[in-house]
């Protein structure tokens, strides 16, 4: 995956690095790399998503009280 950042003439290095970091974060490259380090079965992935949703719902109910 390529991340292309255009640099305008006279633009500061700090600004360019900030742009690069934002593009890097938006592309979610780190997240993809971490996910691909080990294989997770689809059923386990689904179970994890459901557990997170259940936890969020529980927290929402506690906040309403």
UniProtKB/Swiss-Prot annotation:
Annotated GO CC locations: ribonucleoprotein complex; ribosome
Ribonucleoprotein found in the keyword field: yes
This protein's UniProt keywords: Ribonucleoprotein, Ribosomal protein
InterPro entries: Ribosomal_bS21, Ribosomal_bS21_sf
Keyword check for Cell division: no
HAMAP family: Ribosomal_bS21 (MF_00358)
Protein name: Small ribosomal subunit protein bS21
Provenance organism: Aster yellows phytoplasma
Native organism taxonomy: Bacteria, Bacillati, Mycoplasmatota, Mollicutes, Acholeplasmatales
């Amino acid at each position: 995956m390529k991340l292309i950042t255009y640099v305008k003439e006279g633009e500061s290095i700090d600004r360019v690095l900030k742009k690069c970091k934002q593009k890097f974060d938006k592309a979610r490259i780190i997240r993809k790399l971490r996910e691909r380090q080990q294989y997770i079965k689809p059923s386990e992935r689904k179970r994890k998503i459901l557990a997170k949703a259940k936890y969020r719902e529980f927290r929402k109910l506690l906040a309403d009280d």
